[in-house]
Each structure stands twice: as C-alpha cells, then as structure tokens.
Amino acid sequence: MHIKLANPRGFCAGVDRAIEIVNRALEVFGPPIYVRHEVVHNKFVVDDLRSRGAIFVEELDQVPDNVIVIFSAHGVSQAVRQEAARRGLKVFDATCPLVTKVHMEVARYSREGRECILIGHQGHPEVVGTMGQYDTANGGAIYLVEDEEDVARLQVRNPVSLAFVTQTTLSMDDAARMIDALRARFPGIGGPRRDDICYATQNRQDAVRQLAGECQLVLVVGSSSSSNSNRLRELAESIGVPAYLVDGAQDLRREWFDGIRRVGVTAGASAPEVLVRDVIDRLRQWGVVNVEELTGREENITFSIPKELRVVSSD
C-alpha cells in the first residue's frame, strides 16, 4: 500500500495564530484562561489546551468577573463584544483576520443601509458571528442562504441595494454555484471582487482534487465539527473516491483498505501534523511501504498576535 500526502494540509495561519494566543496567554497570565467557544474545531488541540488551564465556554455568562477571555478563531457578534466591554473583561481576540475582513464588509453594508446576503451554514459559529455584525437600526437587513433553494425562496426588501458575503470555509464549487444563483436572481447584487473563501480553504481543496485523482481512497484528518475538514471529505467523494473523516489513528478501520493500493492523506486547517503522523504510523503497521509527499502551493502567510502577548522567553 502506498500513501500520498496532500500539500498543503493542516494548520493555516489563522489557526496557528489562535492557538498561539491561548498558549501565550497561559504563559503570561497563568491559568485559568477562559475561551469563548472552542478556539479551533479540533478535539486534540482543545483537549491539550484544556489540560494546561484553558476553560472553554459557549457564552460569556459562564465567565466570572475579572478574568481573561479569548474569542475563538471563528469570530463573535457585536453583541458579544459589547457584553465583554460592559463587564470590563480583559479580551484577547483570536478571530482569524480573514474572518474579520468579512465582518468589516458586513458592517460597511450595514452602515450604508444596504441589505446583505450571507452564504453559509446555519448555526456555525463563524456564521453566527458574521450575522451579528449587521445592525438593522440603519434600515437594512441580513439574510442567510445555505443552498440554491434558499436563494429561489428569498424575498429581499430592496433588490437594487444588495450585496453578498460568504463564510470563509465553504466548498469553492458550492460557493460558486450559490454566487451564480444570487447573480441570476438579483442581477444588481454587489459583493467582493472574489468570494470570501480564505486562501487556506482554497489551497487544501485544490490539493484534495489532486489527491483524489491519484488515489483510490482519501483520509481527511480533522474533527467532525470542523467545517473545512468536512468540505474536504465531501469534495473527494464528489470526485468519486471513497473518503473518511478521522480525528486520528484510533478512528481507522482495517476493512476500509481491503484491495486499496493508493491512499491519499490530508488534514483540515485545524488539525495538527502530529495526528497525520499517527495515521501514517498506523497504516505502516498495516502494510504501507512508501509515503510520497505531493508538491503543492507554498504557504508563507503569518498573522501577528496582540502586542501584550509578544513576550520573549528568558531562557
């Protein structure tokens, strides 16, 4: 059995930054550090941070006074920010800068009184946070659409003053279809010059396309709560290749590999490389004789952390 590794895979710049913010806060201020929502959607990462003193909560009413709280990489609504400010909580914001970019677009449309349509998955924390950037007090409204049927049913107040944004972790193919449907339904709709899907999501989906073209089965290392990891599995399946989403080596099943000679392995943007290596080690035990790293788009993007956390070790 032969393994091909997708490239790029695993952590993106936004995830690196979010995890570093929690780690640095623990180092500088000591535990407990409160984090609103899982800082990234990966069980291994969250369990590790929890073991070192991070406390994960879903709402600020679970956070006591006079503590440090970190907002997750997915972003939060303006109402959450206002509540934190009202209570005087010390906040470090781990929102991915590419999500913040979408937030700024939505806030601008709101200020202009322009209606906004968000393409995304209902209930996902990024979507909740993005919807919460829109202030209807200026006379506009924001709408969420998940599929083309939603677009067909959507009734807006003012189709000539309308714009769209997208969740950053969507399938590129699905987003393109949705944007086409919106433009067909509302010819005057505005939006970003390109969709808001982030560079890491695009690169990992492109890498999976290559992987699926060369392999008989694809493994995606990532948690079931991770939107971008689920999209990678769905993309491989849409190409006609069986694909499985696994949190780690413990989720592998030997029967998946009966008659399989070429296995593709990738990882979602919130999955650490150590989990990929664990999967490879397990597959070596089951007969893998060769591991090949595919070439792919190089990623050299980094995002800075808050100044207060940029401490230099005294070691």
UniProtKB/Swiss-Prot annotation:
Cofactor section: [4Fe-4S] cluster
Top-level taxon: Bacteria
Gene Ontology annotations of biological process type: dimethylallyl diphosphate biosynthetic process; isopentenyl diphosphate biosynthetic process, methylerythritol 4-phosphate pathway; terpenoid biosynthetic process
Residues that hold (2E)-4-hydroxy-3-methylbut-2-enyl diphosphate according to the record: 41, 74, 124, 168, 226-228, 270
Functional pathway: Isoprenoid biosynthesis; dimethylallyl diphosphate biosynthesis; dimethylallyl diphosphate from (2E)-4-hydroxy-3-methylbutenyl diphosphate: step 1/1; Isoprenoid biosynthesis; isopentenyl diphosphate biosynthesis via DXP pathway; isopentenyl diphosphate from 1-deoxy-D-xylulose 5-phosphate: step 6/6
Binding residues annotated for isopentenyl diphosphate, in chain numbering: 41, 74, 124, 226-228, 270
Binding-site residues, dimethylallyl diphosphate: 41, 74, 124, 226-228, 270
Enzyme nomenclature, EC number: 1.17.7.4
Keyword hit for Metal-binding: yes
Protein name: 4-hydroxy-3-methylbut-2-enyl diphosphate reductase
Organism: Azotobacter vinelandii (strain DJ / ATCC BAA-1303)
Lineage of origin: Bacteria, Pseudomonadati, Pseudomonadota, Gammaproteobacteria, Pseudomonadales
Protein's gene: ispH
